[in-house]
């Protein structure tokens, strides 16, 4: 966990991936820092301080989800993104709102389990290598055939058999020592071995996913699982691949799942972040239709955000200190259309601004995962170095901005469609052409995109 970052450091880290939206970055940075501050308080005071949930308002593609996702990744906190439209009111078929908490705990368990497996990796690899040695040099099968009754009575050949077995054991030990050295030197990596691994059983309760009954299915499956033995199956793998599989198995044996569960539930309760997207789609007063009541979904979300105990397969989880970040474009509705109780549970309001041409230019070149860098890396695998002139970058940004203005505004996602169309021919021919370097100029951009961008009817379908 990295809760020690200052708000300024958090904003600087987010700047590496997200352009603009300073207000949103500041809001999440303060929310994260307050968690660190809360952890330093005396226990009685700590219990009184709940996180201040955030409501992000802004059009699609401006970075709402990315801000929350990068924030969670930065501190290693359990994070899930859910869509408000996927939930249904209690009593209807569909996912109930408590499933978001169960998903958060599952994510937390996975994170903690991976961390603990890393800690025991060296020991697990050592045990996996030992198993590989035993597979490569197996113990001889002991003779269990019919014994002469006279030999059993007088023990005629007993000493001879014992001597023979001890000689075999000595030879096997020598062979295993040699194989150990070869394994350590990496000489047997491509050798094919047959190993027994625990079979991953597909659950008959998978069909319950998305029906709101998955928790019942999990509990029933766990009850059955304790009675049914685990199946194993044989797999033929190279030593290199077998080591990975066996190391994973040994690591899972070495970690204490009770400890994992305890830590995971604690992290979910104290550090968890739930991002509720499209909350504007359940806002509004029109609840008298044949559709599932949107207001009913809001009322179901309310107790989770306020603080409740949710039953999960890992035990009861308190939602009092989980940070909720809700987001919506609010094109057809406004935040005041949410029920008053839910509005009050999101005291921090952040409005994200529409992206300008300058923002598009920065998005194309500045972030660590910038689109221009991604396409350059992809084409470099074909031996082609691609370079964009500053004027070409500007031209791409202007076209993206203009198409957003003329059609639906989908924010930075427009750049993906623009770049795909721009480099479509080059990507198709890259494996066949002999050019070592290609420079993208404004004229090239104009040739590939301008005609389409100017024709509003065409750009709606292509860009």
Curated annotation (Swiss-Prot):
Protein location: Cytoplasm
Keywords of this entry: ATP-binding, Chaperone, Cytoplasm, Nucleotide-binding, Stress response
A molecular-function term among this protein's GO annotations: proteasome-activating activity
SUPFAM superfamilies assigned: P-loop containing nucleoside triphosphate hydrolases (SSF52540)
Chaperone in keyword set: yes
Example of a GO cellular component annotation carried by this entry: HslUV protease complex
Positions contributing to ATP binding: 19, 61-66, 277, 341, 413
Pfam families referenced in this protein's UniProt entry, alphabetically: AAA, AAA_2, ClpB_D2-small
GO biological process: protein unfolding; proteolysis involved in protein catabolic process
Keyword ATP-binding: yes
Source domain of life: Bacteria
PANTHER family: ATP-DEPENDENT CLP PROTEASE ATP-BINDING SUBUNIT CLPX-LIKE, MITOCHONDRIAL-RELATED, ATP-DEPENDENT PROTEASE ATPASE SUBUNIT HSLU
Function (record text): ATPase subunit of a proteasome-like degradation complex; this subunit has chaperone activity. The binding of ATP and its subsequent hydrolysis by HslU are essential for unfolding of protein substrates subsequently hydrolyzed by HslV. HslU recognizes the N-terminal part of its protein substrates and unfolds these before they are guided to HslV for hydrolysis.
Subunit structure: A double ring-shaped homohexamer of HslV is capped on each side by a ring-shaped HslU homohexamer. The assembly of the HslU/HslV complex is dependent on binding of ATP.
Family under the similarity heading: Belongs to the ClpX chaperone family. HslU subfamily.
Protein name per the record: ATP-dependent protease ATPase subunit HslU
Native organism: Bacillus cytotoxicus (strain DSM 22905 / CIP 110041 / 391-98 / NVH 391-98)
Gene: hslU
